Amino acid sequence: GSTDMAIGNAIGSVTANTGMIMAISLIFLPVAIRMSQFAVKGVLMVVSTLVLWLLCRDGVLSLPESMIVLALFVLFIIENIRSAKKLSAEEHTDGAAVVDKSRKALLKNLALFVLGAACLVVGSNLLVDNGTVLAQLLGVSERIIAVTMVAIGTSLPELVTAITAIVKKQSSMSVGNILGANIIDITIILPLCALISGDGLHIAEQSVQQTVYLDMPMCALVAAIAVIPTILHKRFTKLQGILLLALYIAYVFVTVRI
């Protein structure tokens, strides 16, 4: 159905997560990072945005192209498993408490996962349906609603995590959460939409120019600004946060004006 809503929401969420929420974290709190973990996931985020942009330049994410993007998700899962094993080994070395592996704990976490997934499906349907109606009422394209209001709405969990991290002074928690959410948005949500449709994901003709030449490049740009200087200098800076936030505000302004 709402192709513009799906694409705009995924791309807009990544841009909002990085340009607004990560920016706020960097401005208000010095962020300590595990460079070995950040570098791989950060590069994967940048590569994912660039690959998606290149594949969609003709206005279509075809089924074979969807498989290429999904392959990046597989790499993300492999990296998560690798880093989790390494972290677990370090914790055992430090004498940390072992995670409760009882059947009761497993069932509890499984139930919470299913409940969370169900709420996510219901919430996503409400966002898309009401976003479409809102676009019609305001007389604007679904893309504009998707990359601004819907994207910010779906980024609220990351915003809550960022605020909690700032209050508790646990900055790395916020950054790690944002990286993971961004990679998932790009590498699984859009490819799955393309596969479910049966013939790929087609950007609406009236939105191709803005999506391919504004939304996706901006998404790649904020990802690059968040990642590349950090890897080169081995730390985040407040200047990065200010630049990211300024770019995001400018992007939203341009988006609603064109």
Indicate residue ranges for each PLM-predicted region.
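Hydrophobic alpha-helical segments, chiefly the membrane-spanning helices
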Residues: 1-258
